Amino acid sequence: MTPQDFYRTLEEDGFSLSSKQKEQFDTYFKLLVEWNTKINLTAITEENEVYPQHFYDSIAPILQAFLANEPIKLLDIGAGAGFPSLPMKILFPNLEVTIIDSLNKRISFLTLLAQELGLENVHFFHGRAEDFGQDKAFRGQFDVVTARAVARMQVLSELTIPFLKIGGKLIALKAQAADQELEEAKNALCLLFGKVIKNHSYQLPNGDSRFITIVEKKKETPNKYPRKAGLPNKKPL
């Protein structure tokens, strides 16, 4: 998929990009490839693969009408090279985006990237989700939390739901069908007062299947969650 194919596909979906937005995606791709030689950001570096597998996939929740171009507070956990939240931010500039990532080198890349792209209302923090999830400045503060290929739902729910306001939504982007994951995560979702409200499948332009699971937070998260860093992964709920 060339950039032109990408823009054409978005136009067919009702999104006509401005010259500025096209330049932002172009700059994003170039910086991604440049920095990937310094730190491990992605195994996908060919232009015709980055546009469908990273950019298109990242904005899928917007294309599927799960997000609006409003000043909602969005947190991206383990965004790595900025996926999915920064492509979302390019398409929907009104989003207020916060990213937490455990690797400081990735935060350095994201900070430079946001400056080069001219993105406003983006915030980057280095650390573990488990630690920030117990910080009152972050806990229960977000309308939406996104996570793309971060962890199985049994673990992911504990890393993300504490950040949500009541009524807020976790949007989890997956490469595999989530049915088995959701079965395993029933206890975790119950303890964290999260309810699955949508389990959606779609296709990338190349025909590959992808999946979006949306979980709504129904009540305040019990104070003991998230547990200490590493425990959610070692001993899932």
Curated annotation (Swiss-Prot):
GO terms for cellular component: cytosol. It is an enzyme of class 2 (transferase). It is found in: Cytoplasm. Pfam families: GidB. InterPro entries: rRNA_ssu_MeTfrase_G (IPR003682), SAM-dependent_MTases_sf (IPR029063). S-adenosyl-L-methionine binds at G78, F83, A129, E130, R148. Its main location: cytoplasm. Belongs to the methyltransferase superfamily. RNA methyltransferase RsmG family. This is Ribosomal RNA small subunit methyltransferase G.
